[in-house]
């Protein structure tokens, strides 16, 4: 059963979580947005989805309760449940200047707009430092979930804002498995004490959680290879593999599991361990 999260919660002396009020199968209890710092102006990490008045109300309440304002906004990646609230925040929460909204560029680069194009992103790069009173954030490029994904190290706490690279409950989806595994290994090197994830509760055993994620993906890959080795001459579609491997996963999540299996298959095919054919639908079999 998923943990119950408060809509507004002070997690440490410099981190306040404001829940995005957008619960769902992919967002868990909702998107975690964070106010970071200790002063009268703080950094907001992620913004939830568009047109969620409950979130804007909670964010306003948090700003009032902690007597602070938004210095700038950082979004961990381009997905709608992290960038979607930018326009509503800019319209509904007054600021003395236009909000600066920072993110990593897409890779390969492409034009991005905020809302109707009334604002543009300020792009940062791996290793950049973003400061506010009481908090120093270091940008870490962590592609895999998306091509523009960033994590942020909170230097004062040796804590990690992981975006959707690591979730508080369950596992995440990704676009590129090779990049994603490398990103997990890079996050492991940070030796963070705590992880503030993009969805779900705070993770206090950071190293164990990252190792669990790495192990989980390695186990999935081995499960796929086992199916091929035990059925050496047989070809499988991605969904056939899902039904063989994800037996304990609810059927409504099989499409998401298929996405992950396809990424494993692409990686294994690239490594020459399996081959594919498209007659009449795409199937894979073990490579001699």
Swiss-Prot record:
First-listed, main subcellular location of the protein, grouped into a coarse class: mitochondrion
Extract one GO molecular function annotation from the record: single-stranded RNA binding
Protein name per Swiss-Prot or TrEMBL:
Endoribonuclease LACTB2
Q: Which residues carry this modification: Phosphoserine?
A: 235
Tell me any Pfam family this protein matches: BLACT_WH
Which cofactors? Zn(2+)
- Cofactor binding mode and count: Binds 2 Zn(2+) ions per subunit.
This protein's GO cellular component annotations are: mitochondrial matrix
> What positions are modified (N6-acetyllysine)?
102, 282
Q: Does the keyword Acetylation belong to this entry?
A: yes
Nucleus is among the record's keywords: no
Species, as recorded: Bos taurus
Per UniProt, Zn(2+) 2 binds at 81-82, 118, 164, 199
